[in-house]
Amino acid sequence: MADVMERVTKIIVDRLGVEESEVKLESSFKEDLKADSLDVVELVMELEDEFDMEIADEDAEKIATVKDVVDYINNNQ
């Protein structure tokens, strides 16, 4: 899980311009990391590329926290 978390964190830091220390499993994209809906869509696209997977729209809509992303990737790779 650490490798997935590291890769997810790097993408979030690069895309949202937040500090790495702000990215925690419990961090909410919209409330804690100040991402808007377009940011989340772009994050999902980058995550799909990074992990060579497709995240269905209905699944992407359920992603609210960093933990949601990490769990989704771990469960669907």
UniProtKB/Swiss-Prot annotation:
Q: In which pathway does it act?
A: Lipid metabolism; fatty acid biosynthesis
Give any GO molecular function from the UniProt entry: acyl binding
Compartments, record wording: Cytoplasm
Q: Which residues carry this modification: O-(pantetheine 4'-phosphoryl)serine?
A: S37
Fetch the SUPFAM superfamilies from UniProt.
Answer: ACP-like (SSF47336)
What post-translational modification information does the record give? 4'-phosphopantetheine is transferred from CoA to a specific serine of apo-ACP by AcpS. This modification is essential for activity because fatty acids are bound in thioester linkage to the sulfhydryl of the prosthetic group.
| Cytoplasm listed as a keyword | yes
GO BP of this protein:
lipid A biosynthetic process
Q: According to its record, what are the GO cellular component terms?
A: cytosol; membrane
Q: What is its main location?
A: cytoplasm
The segment(s) forming the Carrier domain are: 2-77
Entries under Gene3D superfamilies matching the protein: ACP-like
UniProt keyword terms in alphabetical order: Cytoplasm, Fatty acid biosynthesis, Fatty acid metabolism, Lipid biosynthesis, Lipid metabolism, Phosphopantetheine, Phosphoprotein
Family affiliation: Belongs to the acyl carrier protein (ACP) family.
Q: What does this protein do?
A: Carrier of the growing fatty acid chain in fatty acid biosynthesis.
Stated name of the protein: Acyl carrier protein
Q: What is the name of the gene encoding this protein?
A: acpP
